[in-house]
Amino acid sequence: MNRDQALLNRLWSRVLLEELSRLGVTQVCVAPGSRSTPLTLEANANTAFTLHTHYDERGLGFMALGLAKASQQPVAVIVTSGTAVANLLPAIAESKLTGERLVVLTADRPLELVGCGANQAIVQSGIFSSHVTASLELPSPAIHHPLSWLLTSIDEVMARQALLGGSVHINCPFPEPLYSAGDEAIYQPYLQPVQRWREQARPYTQVHQGLVQSVPAAIDGLLTKGVVIVGSLSLQEAQAAKRFAKAMGWPLLCDPQSGISSQWAHFDLWLQHPKAREQLNQAQCVVQFGSRIVSKRLLQWLEAWCATGLGEYHYIAPHSARNNPWHAMQQQWVCEISHWVDAVLSKRLAGQHTQQGWADELTHYAQSVRQLAQLHFSSSSLSEVALALDLTERATQADLFLGNSLIVRLVDIFSALDGREVFSNRGASGIDGLVATASGVQRARQKPLLMLLGDTSLLYDLNSLALMRNPAQPTVIVVTNNDGGAIFDLLPVPSEQREALYQMPHGMDFAHAASQFGLAYCAAQTLEHYQTLVEEHFAHGAGTLLIEVKTPPQQASMHIKQLTSQLHAL
């Protein structure tokens, strides 16, 4: 048989990508590079794929993360060899903690060119370490490696990903030449053993994984006073959890990432009140749906409650990752949340006594927080707390993406989001890649998007504003500029070094950045001005509007301390 390595590289890539398509991949994110040519050209030729491109691999990885987050489907990423691969690590580390499924296809030099001084060659095998769910180190394409082996190897790592979530890494060495106009007919004998697969549309290996739908055996643990905590979930999952709490008559404490709220909102503040905490301590059961709680006060209460050993702690999530940082006794249910709720309620409410309304008095504290906050921030004064309060009513038909650091904490404390699709990166909680992730979310959902993030976060991901130039739906990015890391005003860092080593003020604004990337820009002057900008852009605008809100560095922390002091006086 004649040999054409470039053609063989292409056939190998075609089979790999076709199998990924049959396993649910429809979105492929591509960065430029020559060594990845076989993968890039075959992805482009496969009509089942929608391609997204970006010149910055770090941003590309986060865009893929956003696509996977919003679509809840695996998303492929194609990059060339060398440091391009290393730039994907932040997004992969995030996906490890939050479960988004990335299929990372990294082109590589063949083995004989690694570690010998060849250009653009680093050790890529195992580069992502424990941050990936599974890895597959492919050999260079050769006819003595059967395509049936390639297919079953892909199916194995993808089945593991389907079960556990997170990213998989498939390293793909391609010898040169990489370009050819040769006739593929010379490789028909090589393709023949997988002819039946080529003629069908299903995966080579079909893995049928069981669903956990049984009624929990420990149902008696739910016959008492309970608390329901809702963490980072899709809106549909969160609404199932809310249905459970309502049926039980238990207090419902909702993280803003869930997109729902309740009468017990603003708990990060009222949990600091001794009487409120004392009443919540009467709980004899905690049922938590989803992970990644923002509120430090709620996490502290949960840790202290678990330490008493006086009740059952149930944790329900679709994936089996451990979510138990205080290592308490726990009943963990790995299943679809709606399945668990339906199973429990069908048995739990069959004429059995319930502790309905045992913690309704706590709603008084939530109302007090809301009233105090509105009293302080009902004027036209523009502040970060005012933005968080306003978010409850603002652009309610748009998807919401929350940045990390200070803004997500303010939203957690002061907002009461209900019925919103909320997205965030609260796995590793880094401030990198937030704009790119939001771009991926919108590309998947094709809906208007409102994003809130801080100035340092935007500086970190400035390159990714290029991804926001032509969104499918109107987009508003709100950057709160407090000139550095104002979050450190809430932390006990050394006061002498706070500004120089923690806050790191930069003295910049974002007008020229918006201009460079072709985005509309406006600096909001008052709260009413901000509200008008947001609503008019969503009603009549197109493209992306960057709204900058400048605030004094210590203002937010001062406001929180004032409200906390007044709440204690109640």
UniProtKB/Swiss-Prot annotation:
Cofactor note (record): Binds 1 thiamine pyrophosphate per subunit.
Root EC class: transferase
Gene Ontology MF annotations: 2-succinyl-5-enolpyruvyl-6-hydroxy-3-cyclohexene-1-carboxylic-acid synthase activity; magnesium ion binding; manganese ion binding; thiamine pyrophosphate binding
Pathway where it operates: Quinol/quinone metabolism; 1,4-dihydroxy-2-naphthoate biosynthesis; 1,4-dihydroxy-2-naphthoate from chorismate: step 2/7; Quinol/quinone metabolism; menaquinone biosynthesis
CDD domains linked: TPP_PYR_MenD (cd07037), TPP_SHCHC_synthase (cd02009)
Keywords: Magnesium, Manganese, Menaquinone biosynthesis, Metal-binding, Thiamine pyrophosphate, Transferase
Pfam families reported for this sequence: TPP_enzyme_C, TPP_enzyme_M_2, TPP_enzyme_N
EC id: 2.2.1.9
Stored InterPro entries: MenaQ_synth_MenD, MenD_middle, THDP-binding, Thiamin_PyroP_enz_TPP-bd_dom, TPP_enzyme_TPP-bd
SUBUNIT field: Homodimer.
Function of the protein: Catalyzes the thiamine diphosphate-dependent decarboxylation of 2-oxoglutarate and the subsequent addition of the resulting succinic semialdehyde-thiamine pyrophosphate anion to isochorismate to yield 2-succinyl-5-enolpyruvyl-6-hydroxy-3-cyclohexene-1-carboxylate (SEPHCHC).
Matches recorded under HAMAP family: MenD
Name the UniProt record assigns to this protein: 2-succinyl-5-enolpyruvyl-6-hydroxy-3-cyclohexene-1-carboxylate synthase
